[in-house]
Amino acid sequence: GPEGSIELTLLDGHKAVFTPEQPLQLPQWFHRRDEELEAQAQALKARAGESGYVEKSNKDETFRYHIARVNDEDDGIHEEPMLTNEDLVLGIRPEFLSITGGGNVECEIYGAMPTGMESTVKVRIGEYLLTGVVFGSTLFTIGSKHLLDITGSSVMLFDRSSGRRITSGTLKLL
């Protein structure tokens, strides 16, 4: 595929390929990220040594996302695992979830709320719950099985450890 396509394993073992909209070389991206983070740390250290420096009370924090699971005990933030450059996050808009045919991953309707010309659906894949928006007046039956596909060309790829957006592209579930 195009330069920089990334093979991913997601949702408890499902395979997918992310294809960036621009050529991408992840090792160079991670190298630049590390250099920028080091430069920021050095600049902060220099500022902290200046007289009159006041530490920000609203420190910048890495965004922590939460993917719903069927048996979530609580909404608390759990202990973060040790992250590597292999830990990536996908940002997928709800309308990019397609369950009207042509997909490769089986999902089950866990919840559905028709709202006029569209329906908000919760689909279950293994123990994960994803929220989608389906256009049209289709009525979905709780528990019915469908094939999930990801459409749309602006699926976002993030670096999990820094929270920074790497690029946008397409995601093909295999």
Regions of interest found by a model, annotated:
Residues 1-174:
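Non-catalytic connector elements of ABC transporters
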